[in-house]
Amino acid sequence: MRPILELPRLSMKERDRRYAAVRTQMAARGLDAIVLWGWPMMWDFYTANSRYLSQIGGNAEFNVLIFPAVGEATSIIQLPTFLDGWRAAQDWVTDIRPRAKTWAHSVASRIKELKLERGKIGMDGLAGPLDPDGWLPRDVYQGLLDLLPGANLVALDDMLEKVRAVKSDEELGVLRKAAQLGDLMLATCRDTARVGVKECEVYASMMHAMVGNGGEEPTLFLWNCDRHPYPHPFRVPTVRPMDSRDLIICEMHPKFGGYFTHVERTFCLGEPDKEQLRIYDGCLAAYQCGLDNFGPGKPISTALMAVKDVIDERGLAICEAGIHGHGLASLEYPRFRHHALAADQQAVKVIGDRFETGMVFAFNIDLVDPRWHGGKTGCVFAETIEITATGARRMHTYPTEFQRLAG
């Protein structure tokens, strides 16, 4: 087997930059080590922290990373059958082990090897500002408490998420490739969606466009198709042949090298209702308002409240509208979503109410008209935005206008 697999990888310089940044934060908290529970849930979003320091992840791989303040990182994956593959897929971590007995036993064993069984150990996966439920199973946590009774296990809260909020040049390069995959997916929908073609056939063609050009699974891809679809795309396509004047609304998180972008569009097989065009025009007006108000040093909340003013002035209502950070996960920092305002006002307090150069986020605007069909149908639009030194730049190139297809 080849010693190096043809997969996206970042440089050792990038690894060293990340290791230094994380260890600075660890020192400030007095942490001897951190354990990052890379649990493949919610399209692999919960593997982001461990993958950030290892490049191990994808296709629902478990990656529990033990990262000491001094010494070598250790990645624990689920099965020994994938050890050689992960050693060939990346060069950041050489100590890769399979789970032995239980996850708690596997982690405790490495902590004891490091002679940190009485140390202060930070962990993600516990309840924190971005996830009030956490994702670490109770029995795993209890097992660690039992196996490491002298250790001080503490929650990391959003320590890693803050470090990940501003992207490096290498990360931006990977995200641009992910955005290109999104453009290909939209072009595939444009070229294949026709009356009589099954929804699932178009969906499959769009997925082929992503994976066939180097993209990675799993990723979020939501879809709905109907004369008057739900206000928000659903989870799965149906086997129904599409009909004239059907509206397609889709949300994709195109993924490359573990990095997600976010793009949404509305298509119609034929001529849409004038109300649908009016709603979509509202999406574009809100989008332009955001671009005009995003930029380094500018207040996040002010920009997003201006977006809401545009929506309100047009008599439209929000299904979803706002921004959320993108990188190795979705729903990263920065976040300010009008449909989850209480949580995200707190997020602004945590990370600050200013855009910074290098931030990348989804800007989605999914709207309805409450006076039409009771607000139960609408249009969607979203793109991934990069904050540059001089303003805001869209990462996608696919046309923004309403997509009329052959009916």
Where are these regions (language model features)?
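Active-site neighborhoods and metal-handling regions in enzymes and metal-associated proteins
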Residues: 1-407
